[in-house]
Structures are given as C-alpha cells and as structure tokens.
C-alpha cells in the first residue's frame, strides 16, 4: 500500500529499475558513475521519486538485504570482517549502502540499528576497500545529518 501520492505502478517500475541496476553495479563500479551519465540520472531520479514513499523504501531495502544475506550465505549483516568478504558480496553491500544513503530519514530506526549499521561496521573497521568504505562512511554521515535535522532547532 503506497504511503504517498506516487501511483503504485510507478513505484513498482522504479523498484525494478533499482533492482536491475543492483545486478549490473559491478560494471558501473568499475568505470565509476561519472562514466554513465544516463545511468546516474535514472538512478538518482528513481531514488528521488521512491523517497516520497517511506513504505516503498523500506520494502526495497528489506528485499535487497534479504537477497544479500541469502545469496551469499551470510548469517548476520556483520558476520564477516571485510577482509573475508568476497568481491561479489562486497559489491552487493556497496550498492545497498548507496541506496540507503539517500533514504536514511525514510527508513525505520529498527532497520537502521539492526541491519544498516551492522552492514557498515566491517567497512568502517577495515578501510582497504575504498568504494565500500566510502559508501559506509556516507551512510553514517547521512545518519548524523538526519539526526541533526530532527534534534537541532531551525534558525528563524
């Protein structure tokens, strides 16, 4: 059930676009997002429209995390140190964190605490994988920004 005025078919299409991009992230990560202008425009536009529906964001992140844990046979988000994570799994985590970075204010606190932060932890502790470290760091900074917006008074 949508929690915004974005029609459900649009939400479904945008969700599928992000899921397809998840499958080809290993290619775009090799060349960088700057090498694919159309990809970047579609990626950030899909994230922007989906961010208007918190339930759609939560469902997509939950599905992506479930696939990550199931596909790579991981028992918990932070079950392995970064040095022992295979490249495919690391790419999957990095893409998920890129998505989450844009939506931290839309996701429930329990998801952040039980899933997102544990996914970030191995890459914040072991900084040898630059893309993953940057994604994890960006998520943490986005969390701080989100918290600041909720707790700091607005200047008037």
Residue ranges: model-predicted function:
Residues 1-52:
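Extended, helix-rich scaffolding/adaptor regions
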Residues 2, 17-24, 71-76, 85-102:
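HEAT-repeat alpha-solenoid elements in large eukaryotic scaffold proteins
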Residues 60-84:
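Acidic, Ser/Thr- and Gly/Pro-rich intrinsically disordered linkers and low-complexity segments
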Residues 95, 134-135:
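Alpha-solenoid helical repeat scaffolds
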Residues 100, 139-146:
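Hydrophobic residues within the alpha-helices of tandem HEAT/HEAT-like
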Residues 109-117:
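Core helices of alpha-solenoid repeat scaffolds
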Residues 118-126, 156:
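HEAT/HEAT-like alpha-solenoid repeats
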Residues 150-155:
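Conserved small/polar residues in nucleotide/adenosyl-binding loops
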């Amino acid at each position: 059930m949508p929690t915004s005025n974005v029609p459900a078919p649009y939400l479904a299409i945008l969700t599928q676009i992000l899921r397809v991009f998840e499958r080809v992230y290993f290619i775009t990560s090799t060349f960088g997002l700057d090498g694919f202008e159309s990809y970047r425009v579609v990626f950030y536009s899909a994230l922007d429209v989906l961010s208007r529906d918190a339930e759609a964001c939560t469902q997509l992140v939950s599905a992506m995390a479930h696939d990550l844990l199931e596909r790579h046979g991981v028992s918990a988000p932070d079950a392995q140190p970064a040095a022992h994570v295979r490249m495919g799994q690391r790419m999957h985590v990095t893409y998920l964190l890129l998505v989450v970075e844009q939506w931290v204010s839309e996701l429930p606190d329990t998801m952040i605490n039980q899933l997102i932060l544990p996914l970030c932890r191995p890459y914040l502790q072991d900084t040898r994988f630059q893309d993953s470290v940057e994604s994890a760091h960006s998520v943490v900074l986005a969390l701080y920004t989100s918290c600041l917006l909720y707790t700091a008074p607005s200047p008037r």
